[in-house]
C-alpha cells in the first residue's frame, strides 16, 4: 500500500510538472520529494492510530480439563476422538467394583438400622411393661415391710428381728430392680429420641453415607459436560486415573462462538471500542478476508497481574510492551468453522475516526492475505 501511494503521488507530481510546465531543478524536485514524504507519512500515521492492526491474534478456544471425581482404573474409553460428542455421552469409565460394594454394604446397614429401630421400640414396650410389673411388686413389698415395721413397735411384737430384716431386704432388692428397669427404659428411649428432622439420627447418617456412595458410583462414568469434542485422547483401559485437580486425564473442547483474541498496541486503546467493525485474515486461508465485530476489551493487561508470594516483587514486564487484549466475534462462515481451533490470524479494527483513511488499511490487509500464498520451506 505504501508503494501504491508513493507511485500515485509520483504520477500526480509528474502530471503537475508537465501540465503547469514547472521547471525541473534541485529546488522543485526537493520540494516534490519532501511533499511526498510528508503526505505518505501523514496518511500512514493517521491510518495506524485510527484503524489499529495487529498480527498477534488467534482463534481462541476454551478447553475444559477432565478430571474424575473418584479414583480408579480406566475400563473403557470413548472412540469418538475429534468427533462431535453430545452432552451426557460417555467419555470414559472407571472400575466400579469397590464403589458398588460400598453402596451394597450401606444399603444392608440401612436395612439393619431400620430393623434395629423396630427392635428398640419393641424393647421399649417390653421395658415399660417390666417397669410397671416390678414397680407393683416393689409397692407390695414396701407395704409388707411397713406392716412388719409397725408390728415391731407394738407392745407385743409378733415378728422376729429376722422377719423384719428379710422384709426390708426384699423391698430394697425390688426397689433396685425398679431403678434398673427405669434406667434401661430411659436408655432405649434416649436412642429412639436422637432425631434429625423427624428421623432417627443413625438412619439419617446412613442415608447420607448411602447418597454419597451412590454419587461416587455414578462418578465412575465420566460424561461430556456439554456438546463438543475431545482430542489427543491418550488414556487407555488400564490407566490409573486419580481425582487430583492438577492431573487431568483428558481435554474437552466445548462448542463455542467463533472468537478471535487479538493483542493490540497500548497506543491504540482510545480507538478500540466495542461494536467497531473488524476484519480478520488467516495464514491458512490466503486471499480471504472475514468480517466481524469487536465485542470487548479486556479490563486488565495480563502482564500487570500479581499474586502474593511472600517476597517483594518488581514489574513483570517493561511498561508499555504488553498489549491490550480484545475479542472479535466473526460472522458465520463454513471456512472458519473448518479451521483448527487455536490457529493464528491478523486483525484490523476500523473506528469512526478518519473513516476515509480506513481504505488504506483494508487494502493493506488484503495484500497481507494474498501474501500468505508466498512462503518457502527449506
Swiss-Prot record:
Sequence ranges on the Periplasmic membrane side: 1-3, 48-54, 254-280, 331-378
Spans traversing the lipid bilayer: 4-24, 27-47, 55-75, 233-253, 281-301, 310-330
One BP term from GO: DNA damage response
SUPFAM superfamilies xrefs: HlyD-like secretion proteins
Residue intervals on the Cytoplasmic side: 25-26, 76-232, 302-309
Transmembrane helix among keywords: yes
GO CC term (a single one): plasma membrane
Topology within the bilayer: Multi-pass membrane protein
Principal location listed in the UniProt entry: membrane
Alphabetically ordered keywords of this record: Cell inner membrane, Cell membrane, Membrane, Transmembrane, Transmembrane helix
Subcellular location(s) per record: Cell inner membrane
Gene3D superfamilies: 2.40.30.170, 2.40.50.100
Pfam families: CusB_dom_1, HlyD_D23
Superkingdom of origin: Bacteria
PANTHER family registered for this protein in UniProt: INNER MEMBRANE PROTEIN YIAV-RELATED, MEMBRANE FUSION SUBUNIT OF EMRAB-TOLC MULTIDRUG EFFLUX PUMP
Family of this protein: Belongs to the membrane fusion protein (MFP) (TC 8.A.1) family.
Protein name, per record: Inner membrane protein YibH
Organism for this UniProt entry: Escherichia coli (strain K12)
Underlying gene: yibH
Amino acid at each position: 500500500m505504501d508503494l501504491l501511494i508513493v507511485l500515485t503521488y509520483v504520477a500526480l507530481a509528474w502530471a503537475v510538472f508537465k501540465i503547469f510546465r514547472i521547471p525541473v531543478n534541485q529546488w522543485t524536485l526537493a520540494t516534490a520529494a519532501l511533499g511526498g514524504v510528508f503526505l505518505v507519512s501523514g496518511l500512514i500515521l493517521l491510518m495506524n492510530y485510527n484503524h489499529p492492526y495487529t498480527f498477534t491474534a488467534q482463534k481462541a478456544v476454551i478447553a475444559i480439563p477432565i478430571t474424575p471425581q473418584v479414583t480408579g482404573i480406566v475400563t473403557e474409553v470413548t472412540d469418538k476422538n475429534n468427533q462431535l460428542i453430545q452432552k451426557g455421552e460417555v467419555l470414559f469409565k472407571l472400575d466400579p467394583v469397590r464403589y458398588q460394594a460400598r453402596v451394597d454394604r450401606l444399603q444392608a446397614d440401612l436395612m439393619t438400622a431400620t430393623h434395629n429401630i423396630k427392635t428398640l421400640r419393641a424393647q421399649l414396650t417390653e421395658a415399660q411393661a417390666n417397669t410397671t410389673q416390678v414397680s407393683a411388686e416393689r409397692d407390695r413389698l414396701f407395704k409388707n415391710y411397713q406392716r412388719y415395721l409397725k408390728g415391731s413397735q407394738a407392745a407385743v411384737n409378733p415378728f422376729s428381728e429376722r422377719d423384719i430384716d428379710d422384709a426390708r431386704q426384699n423391698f430394697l432388692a425390688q426397689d433396685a430392680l425398679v431403678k434398673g428397669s427405669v434406667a434401661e427404659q430411659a436408655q432405649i428411649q434416649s436412642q429412639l429420641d436422637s432425631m434429625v428432622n423427624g428421623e432417627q439420627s443413625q438412619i439419617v447418617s446412613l442415608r447420607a453415607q448411602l447418597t454419597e456412595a451412590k454419587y461416587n458410583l455414578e462418578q465412575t462414568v465420566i460424561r461430556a459436560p456439554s456438546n463438543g469434542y475431545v482430542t489427543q485422547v491418550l488414556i487407555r483401559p488400564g490407566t490409573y486415573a486419580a481425582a487430583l485437580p492438577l492431573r487431568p486425564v483428558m481435554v474437552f473442547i466445548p462448542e463455542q462462538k467463533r472468537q478471535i483474541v487479538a493483542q493490540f498496541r497500548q497506543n491504540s486503546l482510545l480507538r478500540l471500542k466495542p461494536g467497531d467493525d473488524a476484519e480478520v485474515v488467516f495464514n491458512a486461508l490466503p486471499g480471504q478476508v472475514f468480517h466481524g465485530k469487536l465485542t470487548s476489551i479486556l479490563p486488565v493487561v495480563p502482564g500487570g497481574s500479581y499474586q502474593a508470594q511472600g517476597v517483594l516483587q518488581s514489574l513483570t514486564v517493561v511498561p508499555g510492551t504488553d498489549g491490550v487484549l480484545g475479542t472479535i466475534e466473526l460472522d458465520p462462515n463454513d471456512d472458519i468453522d473448518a479451521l483448527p481451533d487455536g490457529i493464528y490470524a491478523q486483525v484490523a479494527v476500523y473506528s469512526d475516526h478518519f473513516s476515509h483513511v480506513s481504505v488504506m488499511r483494508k487494502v493493506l490487509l488484503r495484500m497481507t492475505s494474498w501474501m500468505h500464498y508466498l512462503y518457502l520451506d527449506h
